[in-house]
Amino acid sequence: YEREVELGGYFMELGGWERAHGYAANEHLLEKYGNRVPVRENEWDNRHFWRVSNAEQLALSEDCGIINLSHFYMFDVEGPDHVALMEWLCAAKIGGDNNIGKGIYTHFLDDEGNVRADLTIFRMEDRCRIVDGADAGPRDYHYVKRIAEDKGFDVTVTDVSEEYTTIGIWGPNARENLKKVVSDPAALDPENFPFAAIRNLEIAGKKVSALRLSYVGEQGWELHMKYEDGLAVWDALRAEGIMAVGVETYANSRRLEKSLRLQNADLLTQYNLYEADLARPKVKEADFRGKEKHLEYRARDKQ
């Protein structure tokens, strides 16, 4: 937060977090991109918006940038039934040894097969870590706990949001820039770090769990670390000249470029995954909540 204040962050609140949507320090980009950054002439359209955010997303698309994702809500599900519970809750396949060490983008459905949650699962050997948004995270945490209790799954569900923080790095030059700060640059090569994989790295002497996943339509990584290590990692990346980009680029403009949906805005329980254009090509064999209705929607000629 202190670094974002120094950069002249334009803050808005979400789920109790003050998030910088753009930075005054990047307003020189407005001159660089000129009329590629539109002017919103109507007050209602310009409210709670800063033009520099659109310039930042153009710069990220040409090079790379880092984004503060400290607002992520995270909780661990562990115990004898942790995989069984997540398999029941998630539309995507969670079980199987091949998924250990991967990040899995998935959804929770309700009994009508409609979307009630949109999140990422870290599949570890002994637990699953749910990485969620600041607004939907507390709701999904209590939902998982309630389902586990109601259905008798032998698990422990623990909020770890205040233990870990996240920095995103994305853009066509993300790999080469990230190589400058990790202790083992070769670990980032495509053959060593496939898409959706989780690998342990070291940056500025700090242990970092990196997930190769993109919410913004550009190559890159989520960097997860102990909360107290976040500032050192951020400073190491900034020391290499990597631009800080506001969360507007992550949450809106680049997300829309990738054709992803935003929970509680685009994604509501009145829509199924086919209507949202987020359904996977195949439906997993394992049973999951809402599967019967999901298959019914799949069989329709049109939604």
Q: Where are the regions a protein language model picked out?
A:
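Glycine/proline-enriched, intrinsically flexible loops and inter-domain linkers
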Residues: 1-303
